[in-house]
Amino acid sequence: MPRSTARAAWKRELAATLALGLPLVLTNLAQMAMTVTDVIFIGRLGSQALAASALGANLFTAIEFFGLGLVAATAPMVAHALGRRGNAVRDVRRTVRQGLWTAVIYSVPGCLLLWHGEAILLAIDQPPELAAQAGAYLRALMWAMPPFLGFLVLRSFVAALQRPRSAFLIALAAIVLNVFGNWVLVFGNLGAPALGLVGAGLASALATLGLFLGMVGVVCLDRRFRRYHLFGDVWQPDWQRLAEFWKLGLPIGAATAFEVTIFNAAAFLMGWLGEPELAAHAIAIQIASVTFMIPYGIAQAATVRVGHAYGARQPDQVARAGWCAFSLGIGSMAIAAALMLLAPGLLVSAFLDIGDPANAQVLRLATAYLAVAALFQIVDGAQVLGAGMLRGLHDTRVPMLYAALGYWGVGLPSGAALAFWAGWRGVGVWSGLAIGLALVAVLMMQRWLRRDRVGLLRRA
């Protein structure tokens, strides 16, 4: 390929990745905003309600994110079918329908566990009063799981067709619905009973149902999606495609669960160190979570772009799609890392009154954690981008093993050893997380570089 032609191909791919990735990033941030609005309303109920909601949310997240990873198989399977062309409409329809089946199937045991949330929290030695409140909250919030997983399936479908803007607009509308629902149900406005923490859970469930119904409306009414007839005979079982879906999705779900639960475990370690450490950790992890949404959205775009090229059997395009996404993601995280190093006080001030002398210790600790998080950003971005690129090649089992090794085999033990044995305390916990993420990032990128040698490109 002539140099000018190659340069033009790279520019086109970079533009396509950005056009797909930006709406996905914004959709992820909008979904985070729903959680933030819940915290704001619950905070007005008092510190005990806030603590109970945090307990419940941690359990909900651990269970929900396995399902999130499971239904994430939708994007690479749909993208591969579209790239391969052939009988793409039928293949896409089969995959999306079985994605919706998977959302329902997983939600049954997931909701059953959440229904018994109080018993689970008591079993891990949480305070009985907080466990009771968290249990009631979870019995309301659990109804958000089925529509949320269904929304993710349909969002993956429209993203694979490279039309992600509708999902972002629906997510914005869901934020408004969530705020209104909290105002009505938490405090008892417009004649509704004041349900407090339970009302916040119900508001989230209703807003999430709105997310799903909005996406159903889009795929049924928009002519670009309507031709796939996703909901015709949706209850007809397709056991072969369902098995293929779970074969690809189960390792994604496990890897996602490994990552989410290590952060939950890190919070427990911080709790053992003391209240200031836990408060500073909560602030730093919230900042890191916001910036993580950028490479996470770009990684979702990478799965689609790589998946299209993989289905079309275009190895050069596979490389371009992967490296363009990687460059965009790492570039964004480098900017985030610089901001954490140069202006930590500005970032912390969004969550804490840094002028209050009573907050001086938390400010000092949060600033120290953000210094470690600057490195954390680069490797966290690299691992999620690597996972997204490999996912486009339908490579999920080995990345799952990398995640288990890096997070639980190295990251958490390193963090505990540095915190308690070496005396680094909270900085040790964060350093352990960074070490684990760095190992996963190196392993993911090494596998991507060896994709042809290990036979990933020959499976299309």
Swiss-Prot record:
Keywords: Antiport, Cell inner membrane, Cell membrane, Ion transport, Membrane, Transmembrane, Transmembrane helix, Transport. One of its GO terms (cellular component) is plasma membrane. It is a multi-pass membrane protein. It is found in: Cell inner membrane. Pfam families: MatE. The chain crosses the membrane at residues 20-42, 57-79, 100-122, 137-159, 166-188, 198-220, 250-272, 282-304, 325-347, 362-379, 400-422, 427-449. InterPro entries: MATE_fam (IPR002528), MATE_MdtK (IPR050222), MdtK-like (IPR048279). PANTHER family: FMN_FAD EXPORTER YEEO-RELATED (PTHR43298:SF2), MULTIDRUG RESISTANCE PROTEIN NORM-RELATED (PTHR43298). This is Probable multidrug resistance protein NorM. It comes from Bordetella bronchiseptica (strain ATCC BAA-588 / NCTC 13252 / RB50).
